[in-house]
Design a protein with these regions (language model features):
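A generic structural signal for nonpolar/aromatic side chains embedded in well-ordered alpha-helices
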Residues: 19-20, 65, 104, 129
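A generic local structural motif
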Residues: 12-15, 39-40, 58-60, 113-115
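Short, basic/aromatic recognition patches
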Residues: 2-27
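Short secondary-structure boundary/capping segments
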Residues: 17-18, 43, 63, 117-119
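Short beta-strand segments
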Residues: 23-57, 63-65, 71-75, 85-86
Length: 143
């Protein structure tokens, strides 16, 4: 069997807890007015079966999502075993409270720098994406 054909399938987010716990930069896809896709690197956290992304309220991603709430996000490893997850669905937008901003900033920048970033008091929007569809992969058995 070729390497691609042996990929483990039917994975769930629970199978990928280690991956989702890592501070990997995700890619968020939103739709422009003309239907083109905008791909944006984002910080995220996986919580309660969905992704939280925080961005400034006036960001282009938020403008897109107000017009069209469909989005996808992908998180993946750049080294073996090349695990990843893609989630698509409709987002909910809300105000990001200080605790969410701090949690995500500390996740990516560490305690001191993340705290300093969060203390700047941004006007942030919380983008919440729960799976409408999910695709996950893991090439561990192939390597």
């Amino acid at each position: 069997m070729n390497k691609i054909g042996a990929m483990r399938k039917n994975l769930t987010p629970d199978d990928l807890d280690g991956l989702l716990a890592r501070p990997l930069v995700a890619v968020l896809a939103t739709y422009r007015d003309n239907g083109d896709v905008l791909l944006s690197p984002v910080w995220h956290r996986w919580r309660d079966g969905g992704f939280d992304v925080v961005t400034r309220g006036d960001d282009v991603k938020v403008r897109h999502l107000r017009e069209d709430p469909r989005a996808s996000i992908v998180v993946f490893e750049h080294e073996p075993p090349y695990r990843g997850i893609e989630v698509g669905g409709r987002v909910e937008l809300g105000r990001a409270d200080a605790d969410v901003v701090r949690d995500i900033a500390v996740r990516y920048l560490g305690g001191e720098e993340g705290g300093a970033y969060a203390d700047q008091g941004h006007d942030d929007t919380l983008i919440r994406l729960e799976p409408g569809r999910l695709r996950a992969w893991d090439f561990a058995d192939d390597l």
